[in-house]
Design a protein with these regions (language model features):
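Macromolecular interaction modules
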Residues: 1-107
């Protein structure tokens, strides 16, 4: 299982419309990527490591699926549509990373 994460570094003077991102872009991404995604989540930064410090990331999206190949098979056909939507909510250049997902039981 892998998790594709897309992070938006929080930079001074940057623009990020969390309302549009959460209510338009992410639901569209989940719908377009379809059943290959086992889970789709979004997080909005609220604070940094020190109280009052700006968060390192304006937002983080996570897409869980079986493999990088499965993600790419779902993403490639809709990538233009998703990428053209980015300027509607931000001027931040997103960073994408694929991670192996290791789960630990909570006690």
């Amino acid at each position: 299982m892998i998790k594709a994460i897309i992070v938006y570094p929080n930079k001074p003077g940057s623009r990020f419309d969390a309302d549009y991102y959460l209510n338009v872009h992410m639901p569209m991404a989940a719908r377009l990527l379809g059943p290959a995604m086992k889970a789709v989540t979004a997080e909005i930064g609220v604070d940094g490591g020190t109280p009052g410090q700006a968060p390192a990331f304006a937002a983080i999206a996570a897409f869980t699926c079986e493999s990088v190949e499965d993600f790419m098979l779902a993403f490639k056909p809709v990538s233009d549509q998703l990428q053209k939507d980015i300027p509607k909510y931000t001027d931040i250049e997103p960073i994408i990373q694929f991670n192996n997902l290791i789960e630990f039981p909570a006690k």
